[in-house]
Amino acid sequence: MPQSLTKILVHIVFSTKHRADLITPEVEPNLHAYLGGICRELDSPLVAVNGTPNHIHMLVNLGRTVSVSDLLLNVKRDSSKWMKTKSSNFSDFHWQDGYGAFSISESAVPRLQDYIANQKERHAALTFEDELRALCRKYNVTLDERYSWS
């Protein structure tokens, strides 16, 4: 085959450092748009994004020449720098070191889009830690909690 064809859908989750509630309603829409721009620059269109004051969920169609780790390196580095320019309240803004990244099938996209869209309602009764534990169980990923909450 003379061309490379891919469709790699990835559900990505990461939090602010120490799960600090730093993503305010005022900055959230612009942050989401900025995340979309970073993904677009890496030929990895953002299909859905949402979150809470302390974490982000993204559904990304991963580009054929970018790895998940390279995508997240750029997303977290660039958006952290951007956040720090928005207000002195964000001068200490950092993302956590790690992330969760889970492959999903095309048939799961509508359900995941709903899941991402309803983050604030979901977290009225669920912590980020409990959500990540549930996602790891769902996707059969081993979670070592000694390294998961920094």
Feature map (PLM): residue ranges:
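Basic nucleic-acid-binding interfaces
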Residues: M1-S150
